[in-house]
Amino acid sequence: MSYKLKFLPSALKEWNKIGSTIRDQLKKKLKERLNDPDVPADRLTGFKNHYKIKLRSAGYRLVYEVDQGNVSVIVITVGKRERSEVYIKAKKISQ
């Protein structure tokens, strides 16, 4: 079953700011995740139903939430991993 992709407004702004190369890499990974979003290895501790997509070489992270009720994947935030900023931002948004 394929999930629908949704963005929080703040995440969409961040998405539009990143370069096209990084965006293309994230699109490819997101496409895979829409078929199977529950990846235990990428589950974020301290969050409920939140997962990450990592681009190690670029240092970017995308944090998303799986909404089983609406069969959707909601992008919470996108950004550099520097000083765990992307995870701190995700925690603030999710509260």
Predicted regions and their residues:
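Solvent-exposed, charged interface segments at domain starts and junctions
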Residues: 1-2, 41
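Enriched for short, Lys/Arg-rich terminal
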Residues: 2-6, 12-13, 17, 24, ...
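Flexible interhelical turns and helix-capping residues at alpha-helix boundaries
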Residues: 15, 19, 34-37
